[in-house]
């Protein structure tokens, strides 16, 4: 009787980390970020369309919780990226394309960090930030001016 062997290298080759691909962890963090962004946008649209009341408050808690989760995932993603550099650009790519790619990535990361930060800074208006109703994030000192500026910046983003 011959031992059972299963050939997986050809099927899993596209998923295997290599010098020319992002690691599986980087790919998973990327797609988790995408999923969270896709989830938060309709939540925001529904939340702002609701009349003030308990239902809008529940949506706000969920919206803020998604924002906190996005922030945490992006921080983990950046830490991973710092310890696991991106694969090199395709050979022959024009230098200007590499520069555009790097600038675009930097701006996306900045936006992914600044949106949750400005959202959290809005709590300087005195409202606590609850994470899924499980616990509150540390309360910022009440500062109406900071809350107002954060509100404007968050809405511009």
Predicted regions and their residues:
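Membrane-embedded alpha-helical bundles that constitute the cytochrome b-like, heme-associated redox core
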Residues: 1-157
């Amino acid at each position: 009787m011959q031992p059972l062997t299963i050939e997986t290298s050809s099927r899993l080759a596209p998923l295997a980390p290599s010098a020319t691909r992002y690691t599986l962890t980087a790919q998973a963090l990327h797609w988790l970020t995408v999923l969270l962004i896709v989830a938060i946008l309709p939540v925001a649209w529904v939340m702002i369309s609701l009349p003030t009341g308990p239902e809008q408050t529940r949506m706000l808690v969920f919206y803020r919780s998604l924002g906190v989760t996005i922030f945490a995932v992006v921080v983990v993603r950046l830490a991973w990226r710092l310890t696991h550099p991106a694969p090199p650009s395709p050979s022959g790519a024009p230098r200007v394309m590499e520069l555009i790619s790097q600038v675009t990535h930097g701006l996306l990361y900045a936006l992914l960090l600044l949106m949750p930060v400005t959202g959290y800074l809005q709590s300087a208006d005195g409202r606590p930030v609850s994470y899924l109703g499980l616990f509150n994030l540390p309360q910022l000192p009440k500062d109406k001016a900071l809350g107002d500026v954060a509100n404007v910046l968050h809405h511009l983003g």
